[in-house]
Amino acid sequence: MAPSARNRKPGARSMAKAAALRKPKKKVNPLDKDGITYIDYKDTALLRKFISDRGKIRARRVTGVTSQQQRQIARAVKNAREMALLPYTATAR
């Protein structure tokens, strides 16, 4: 018996097997849900939903948007930062 299998309870699966068998939950696209078709750089309330607490743009897999929408969000966030509507980084603690 392998050392890791010896410590395992009977009938228990390894974490890797359990993760492989689990079906990933489908992300709901927040822009489609709200009916937003155009992402404006002046809409800072919307853009803040796609920025982390550290000021980074969140990934597609986290937000659930399409690749085209992700590019539009990135462009809008960068424009808003340039126009001083959004900070480049988060405030220091």
Curated annotation (Swiss-Prot):
Residues 1-27 are annotated as: Disordered. The keyword Aminoacyl-tRNA synthetase does not apply. Residues 1-11 have a biased composition (Basic residues). Pfam families: Ribosomal_S18 (PF01084). It comes from the Bacteria. GO terms for biological process: translation. One of its GO terms (cellular component) is cytosolic small ribosomal subunit. One of its GO terms (molecular function) is small ribosomal subunit rRNA binding. Keywords: Ribonucleoprotein, Ribosomal protein, RNA-binding, rRNA-binding. The keyword RNA-binding applies. InterPro entries: Ribosomal_bS18, Ribosomal_bS18_CS, Ribosomal_bS18_sf. NCBIfam families: S18 (TIGR00165). Belongs to the bacterial ribosomal protein bS18 family. Part of the 30S ribosomal subunit. Forms a tight heterodimer with protein bS6. Binds as a heterodimer with protein bS6 to the central domain of the 16S rRNA, where it helps stabilize the platform of the 30S subunit. This is Small ribosomal subunit protein bS18. The gene is rpsR.
